[in-house]
Regions:
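Boundary/entry segment of secreted carbohydrate-active catalytic domains
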Residues: 30-81
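Extracytoplasmic
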Residues: 463-904
C-alpha cells in the first residue's frame, strides 16, 4: 500500500486539534491499534436493532420525543398493561412515542403484571384466584383455570383492544424462567414448563383471533443466559406441537459475555439446523452491565457483535425506567451513550461491511461497525474500546467515491450517566484526500478507551471542512494539581461489572476538607466568555463548590443531586454542572474548591470529580450540522450531481425531509441558520420538537443563508426541514442568542397565586438546594382545586405558541425492588382560564431529591390574551415547582441574505 495515501503525509489535509484538549496519561502511553474496513465487502442490510431497551421508556414524554427519535430505537421491552412490577413503563402508555418514527417491535414482559420480584414469590401460581377479565380484579377463589393463564388473557386482551399497533407487539410469557422464576429446576419442572408454554401460546393466539388480528408474535424462552440443553428441549417440543417462538430470547449479562456471545449464537444456530428449523429471529432482551451504560467505547463492542450477527438486543434495566437505561441525561439531554445510539441509528438504509478488529471474542478490545450508504454516498465507521492508544484506520473499497474524498472524524467522550455531552466535535477534518487503489489510511488519536468515534467518508464536497471550529480544552480531574483530595482508580473489571466507569480510568474523591481544591492551569485564545463544565457525582443531594480564577472567586458551582440509593450508584452515578465565566486571553489557573473562604465547607461539597471541560462560548458557540451527516426521509437524499452543490441535501416536495438533532446547552433563544441553494423562489419549513415554528424563504435562484430566532430547550432538539419548491441544503447552524432571553417571562412559583393545598416550600442554605431564591411551591395536584395560577402579563399577553420551562423536583418512589428504584413520573397539566382547550401537559421524571431541581419544557398553545395559566393535576400529585419561564417560540421575522461564497463548516 502506497504511503502517499496516509493522511499524516498528504499535503491536501487540514487537521485542526481542539485547543489543548488532551488525552489521559494512560491513553498516551498505549500502543496503536489497527481497524480495517472494506467498504466493497458488504455483509447485509443494516439491522439497527442493537440499541433496544428494557424499560427504557417511562411514561409519555419520558424520555422526550426528541431523545426517542434521535436515538432511533427500534425495539423495547416494557411492562404489561396494568402491571404492578414497577410504577411506570406501561407499554400502552409509551407506545405512541415509541412508534412515532423508528419503533418497530414493542415487547412486553407479561409476568411484570405481578408486583414482586421474583414473580409471585418465585413460585409458580396455582389455581387460587378468579380473575375478572373486564377489570383485572380477582377474588381469592379457585375457578378451575390456572391463575397465570388468566393474567395472560387479561394482558393480551388489553393490548388487542387498547393498542393502536397490536400487530407490532411481541409477548414474552416468561422472564428468566431458569432463574428464580418458577422453572429453575429443569429436571423436575421441564414437563410443567412445556405444558405451560403451549397453554399460554394457545391462549394468546385465541385472543388475537377473536379480534381478527392474525398471528400474535411470542418471544421466549427468556433464560438468564444461553442454556443449550433447555433450549433444545423447548425447541423440540415447540416444533412438535406447533408452538415455536417467533423470536428466540436469552440474556447476555456479564463482562465475559463479550468473549462468549458469538459462540452462544453459533451454538443456537447449529441447534436450529440440527432440529430442521429455519432461522428464528433473535433478541437478547437483556445485555450489558453498569460499566457499559453511557460509555461509548463499551457500547460499541456490544453493538458491533449484534450488528455483525444481525440480531436485536436490549440494554439491561439496572436502575430506573425512562432514561434508555442510563443512556440519556437529565430530562432531555444526551450523555455520551445517547450519541453512540444516535450515530448507530444514522446508519439506517446502509449496507454493513466487513470490519477486521485486532481481535474478536475478547473482552474490552477495539471494535467497530462499518457501513456504506449508496444512496447518500456516505461511508461510516463507528469504533471504540481497545488499548486507549491511537487507532490506525485502513479503509478500502472506496473506488466508487472517485479519486478524492472528504473525511470527518468526530469524538464522543465519556460524560457520566447523568452528565451532559454536547454535539460531538470534529477532531479531524480532511479535505480532498487522494484515494489510491480504493484505499485510504489515517491515524486518529484516542482520548481514552471509553470514548467512541465516528468517521464519515464522502466524495469530495463543495464546502470547507474544519476541525476545532469552537475552541475547547479538557483535563482529567486526577491530572490537576490536587490539595486535600484523593485519586481513586476505577477498575472496569472490578465488582463483576457493577460499577459506572470513570473517564481516564480514575477520578478524584475525598473532596471534603475546607482546603480541598483542584487547580487546572490552562491557556485560552482570546478575551471572552467560557463555559466551565465539571463531570462528577453528588451523593444523592444537591451540592456546591466555588470556582476561583487566578485566586479570585469567579462563580459558585451548583450541582444537582445524582442517583445514590445503592453502593454502586453513590459517588459513581456522575452528572455534570456548568458555569459561564469571563476570561482574558492567556494563561489562567482555574481552581475548583470545596470552600469559598478556606475555612467553611460549602453545602454537600463532598463530590467526586472526574473531568473538567472549558469551551469558548463568546460567539454563541456556533454548531454546524452538515448535510452529509443528516437523516433524510420521504425520498430526500444527499446529491453529488449538481455543480457547486456536491454533498448538499436535495429536499423537494411533500413528505421529503431532513432531520437535525441539535444540542442546546441551555434553554433559551438560538439563531437557526440554514445555508442552501435554490433554482427558483423557494420556502423552507422548520418544525422544532414536533411543532411548526417558522418558514424561511428565498426570492429567486441563488445561494442563501436564512436565519430564524427560535426558542430551543436544554438538551436535544429535533429540527425537521422541508421544502415544497425544493432546495439544496448545505448545512444547518445553531448559535446561542442569550441576549434575546429577556423576551421570556420568569415567574417564581412561590409568587404565583396558590389554591387549595398548594404551599410555599422553603429550603435552607445548608441543604445545597439549587432552588431559585431557596423557595418554591409544593403540594400541587391530587385534586382539581390544588393549583397555582399565573396571571397573564407583558411578554405572554397574546394568543399563540409558547414554551413553558418548568424548574421542578420529583423524588417520589412507590414500593421497593431488589435493584430498580421504583420511580414515579409525575404529571403537570397547564390550563388557560377562559379556554376549553388544554394548553399542555408533560410527565416529569425523577430528580433524586425533593430539593434538587431539573427543568422540563412544555409546549403550549394559548387561545386568549387575558386567561391565567393554571398549573395542577386533578388525579395525582404534580411535581414541586421552583420557577416557570414563559417564552414565545420565535422572535422577530426570519432573514435571508445572499451568499457569494460557500460558508465554512
Amino acid at each position: 500500500m502506497k504511503k502517499a495515501a496516509k493522511l499524516v503525509a498528504a499535503s491536501v489535509i487540514t487537521t485542526l486539534a481542539l485547543g489543548s484538549l488532551s488525552a489521559p496519561v494512560a491513553a498516551l502511553e498505549a500502543i496503536t491499534d489497527t481497524l480495517s474496513v472494506d467498504f466493497s465487502q458488504t455483509t447485509g442490510s443494516f439491522r439497527g436493532g442493537a440499541t433496544g431497551t428494557l424499560y427504557g421508556f417511562g411514561d409519555e414524554g419520558a424520555p422526550t420525543q426528541a431523545l426517542i427519535n434521535g436515538a432511533a430505537i427500534t425495539n423495547t421491552s416494557q411492562k404489561a398493561p396494568h402491571g404492578t412490577q414497577h410504577p411506570s413503563g406501561d407499554a400502552l402508555k409509551v407506545e405512541d412515542g415509541f412508534f412515532q418514527k423508528h419503533g418497530k417491535d414493542m415487547y412486553i414482559y407479561i409476568q411484570d403484571y405481578y408486583p414482586d420480584w421474583s414473580y409471585h414469590g418465585g413460585v409458580r401460581p396455582a389455581d387460587t384466584r378468579t380473575y375478572n377479565q373486564a377489570t383485572g380484579a380477582y377474588s381469592n377463589e379457585p375457578n378451575g383455570i390456572w391463575d397465570y393463564l388468566e393474567v395472560v388473557e387479561f394482558v393480551t386482551e388489553a393490548v388487542a383492544t387498547g393498542s393502536s399497533r397490536p400487530k407490532d407487539y411481541v409477548f414474552i410469557p416468561f422472564n428468566e424462567p431458569d432463574g428464580g422464576n418458577w422453572y429453575a429446576n429443569w429436571s423436575t419442572m421441564k414437563a410443567t414448563f412445556l405444558a405451560d408454554w403451549k397453554a399460554i401460546y394457545t391462549k394468546i393466539q385465541e385472543v388475537y383471533a377473536r379480534h381478527n388480528l392474525g398471528h400474535a408474535r411470542i418471544g421466549g424462552p427468556g433464560d438468564t443466559r444461553w442454556q443449550p440443553a433447555r433450549s433444545a428441549d423447548i425447541l423440540t417440543f415447540a416444533k412438535a406441537n406447533g408452538v415455536l417462538p417467533d423470536i428466540f430470547i436469552w440474556h447476555e449479562l456479564g463482562i465475559d459475555n463479550l468473549r462468549t456471545f458469538r459462540s452462544h449464537f453459533a451454538e443456537y444456530r447449529q441447534l436450529e439446523k440440527d432440529l430442521g428449523l429455519g432461522p428464528i429471529p433473535i433478541n437478547i432482551t437483556e445485555y450489558g452491565m453498569l460499566r457499559d451504560m453511557g460509555t461509548p467505547g463499551q457500547l460499541v463492542q456490544w453493538l458491533s457483535i449484534m450488528e455483525d450477527l444481525k440480531v436485536d438486543g436490549q440494554t439491561a434495566y439496572w436502575n430506573y425506567a425512562g432514561n434508555f437505561n442510563d443512556n440519556s441525561a437529565r430530562t432531555n439531554s444526551a450523555n455520551a451513550g445517547w450519541w453512540m445510539y444516535k450515530w448507530y441509528g444514522d446508519l439506517a438504509g446502509s449496507q454493513t461491511v466487513k470490519v477486521t478488529p485486532p481481535a474478536l471474542n475478547t473482552v474490552d478490545t477495539l471494535q467497530g461497525i462499518g457501513a456504506i450508504d449508496t444512496k447518500n454516498r456516505r461511508a461510516t465507521v463507528l469504533y471504540g474500546g481497545g488499548s486507549g492508544g491511537a487507532v490506525s484506520l485502513k479503509l478500502a473499497g472506496l473506488s466508487s467515491f472517485g479519486t478524492k474524498v472528504d473525511i470527518e472524524v468526530r469524538e464522543n467522550t465519556l460524560s457520566g450517566a447523568e452528565g451532559v455531552a454536547g454535539t460531538p466535535p470534529v477532531i479531524k477534518a480532511l479535505k480532498g484526500v487522494r484515494v489510491v487503489n480504493g484505499t485510504v489510511e489515517l491515524e486518529v488519536p484516542t482520548y481514552d478507551r471509553y470514548a467512541g468515534y465516528q468517521v464519515i467518508v464522502t466524495p469530495e464536497q463543495d464546502r470547507t471542512l474544519e476541525a476545532g471550529k469552537v475552541w475547547a480544552a479538557s483535563v482529567e480531574a486526577e491530572n490537576t494539581n490536587l490539595t486535600a483530595a484523593t485519586v481513586y482508580t476505577q477498575d472496569p473489571l472490578s465488582g463483576g461489572g457493577w460499577k459506572f466507569l470513570a473517564s481516564g480510568g480514575r477520578d478524584v474523591g475525598s473532596f471534603n476538607q475546607p482546603t480541598s481544591k483542584a487547580d487546572w492551569t490552562v491557556s485560552v485564545p482570546r478575551d471572552g466568555k467560557y463555559r466551565f463544565q465539571i463531570i462528577g457525582a453528588t451523593p444523592g443531594t444537591p451540592g456546591r463548590h466555588a470556582l476561583f480564577v487566578d485566586n479570585v472567586m469567579a462563580s459558585p458551582v451548583q450541582y444537582t443531586a445524582n442517583l445514590a440509593l445503592t453502593s454502586y450508584q453513590k459517588w459513581q452515578y456522575r452528572g455534570s454542572a456548568e458555569v459561564t465565566i469571563p476570561l482574558t486571553a492567556g494563561q489562567h489557573t482555574l481552581s475548583l474548591r470545596a470552600s469559598a473562604d478556606g475555612t467553611t465547607l460549602l453545602p454537600n461539597s463532598d463530590i467526586t470529580l472526574d473531568k473538567f471541560l472549558l469551551t469558548d462560548v463568546t460567539d454563541g458557540e456556533p454548531t454546524v450540522y452538515p448535510a452529509s451527516t443528516l437523516r433524510y426521509a420521504g425520498g430526500a437524499a444527499v446529491t453529488y450531481g449538481v455543480a457547486q452543490a456536491r454533498g448538499h441535501g436535495s429536499i423537494r416536495g411533500a413528505g421529503q425531509r431532513a432531520d437535525v438533532y441539535a444540542q442546546a446547552w441551555e434553554t433559551g433563544y438560538y439563531d437557526i441558520s440554514v445555508d442552501y441553494r435554490t433554482t427558483a423562489a423557494a420556502k423552507v419549513g422548520i418544525r422544532v420538537n414536533g411543532r411548526a415554528v417558522t418558514q424561511l424563504s428565498a426570492p429567486r435562484l441563488g445561494v442563501w443563508r436564512s436565519t430564524a430566532r427560535v426558542h430551543l430547550v436544554q438538551g436535544i432538539n429535533e429540527l425537521e426541514l422541508s421544502s415544497a419548491n425544493g432546495i439544496l441544503l448545505q448545512q444547518v447552524t445553531t448559535t446561542r442568542a442569550a441576549s434575546a432571553d429577556s423576551a421570556a417571562v420568569v415567574v417564581e412559583a412561590e409568587n404565583a397565586v396558590r389554591h387549595g393545598t398548594a404551599v410555599v416550600n422553603t429550603y435552607t442554605p445548608a441543604s445545597g438546594s439549587n432552588a431559585s431564591g431557596l423557595k418554591g411551591a409544593g403540594y400541587i395536584g391530587n385534586g382539581a382545586g390544588n393549583t397555582i395560577e399565573v396571571p397573564r402579563g407583558p411578554g405572554f399577553d397574546k394568543p399563540g405558541e409558547y414554551n413553558v420551562v418548568v424548574s421542578y423536583a420529583n423524588a417520589e418512589l412507590s414500593g421497593a425492588h431488589d435493584y430498580n428504584p421504583q420511580v414515579v413520573d409525575r404529571r403537570l397539566n397547564i390550563t388557560e382560564t377562559g379556554s376549553t382547550t388544554p394548553a399542555g401537559h408533560a410527565y416529569f421524571r425523577y430528580t433524586y431529591a425533593w430539593n434538587s431541581f431539573l427543568e422540563r419544557t412544555i409546549p403550549v398553545t394559548l387561545h386568549t390574551s387575558t386567561g391565567s395559566l393554571v398549573f395542577g393535576n386533578p388525579t395525582a400529585f404534580a411535581p414541586d415547582l421552583d420557577k416557570l419561564t414563559i417564552a414565545p417560540t420565535t422572535l422577530g421575522t426570519p432573514t435571508t441574505i445572499p451568499r457569494t461564497r460557500i460558508p465554512q463548516s
